[in-house]
Amino acid sequence: MPRSLKKGPFVDQHLYLKVLAENEKGSKNVIKTWSRRSMIIPDMLGHTIAVHDGRKHVPVFVTESMVGHKLGEFAPTRTFRGHVKDDKKGKRR
């Protein structure tokens, strides 16, 4: 069930303040965050936000099509190594 429109998007306060500070300065420095639950808002457009995936920070460049999604959607936490291939042709009994 989506969030109520009257509540508005959720953005962690510390992340929002960092984005506003970068907008005031007019600079586009990388902003590090652990807040995967924060929603991408139009104020973040053009910024690179380094989202923590559990072991490192993944840089995410925010574009217009990302607005309304959460930051964690763009930093995968699991790595898929592939299934083990059964090589039955090469084995002899």
From Swiss-Prot:
Keyword Ribosomal protein: yes
Organism lineage: Bacteria, Bacillati, Actinomycetota, Actinomycetes, Micrococcales
Keyword entries, A-Z: Ribonucleoprotein, Ribosomal protein, RNA-binding, rRNA-binding
Cross-referenced SUPFAM superfamilies: Ribosomal protein S19
Family the entry assigns: Belongs to the universal ribosomal protein uS19 family.
Protein name: Small ribosomal subunit protein uS19
GO terms under cellular component: cytoplasm; small ribosomal subunit
GO molecular function, one term: structural constituent of ribosome
Gene3D superfamilies assigned to the protein according to its UniProt record, in alphabetical order: 30s Ribosomal Protein S19, Chain A
Keyword rRNA-binding recorded: yes
One of the GO biological process terms: translation
Function, as annotated: Protein S19 forms a complex with S13 that binds strongly to the 16S ribosomal RNA.
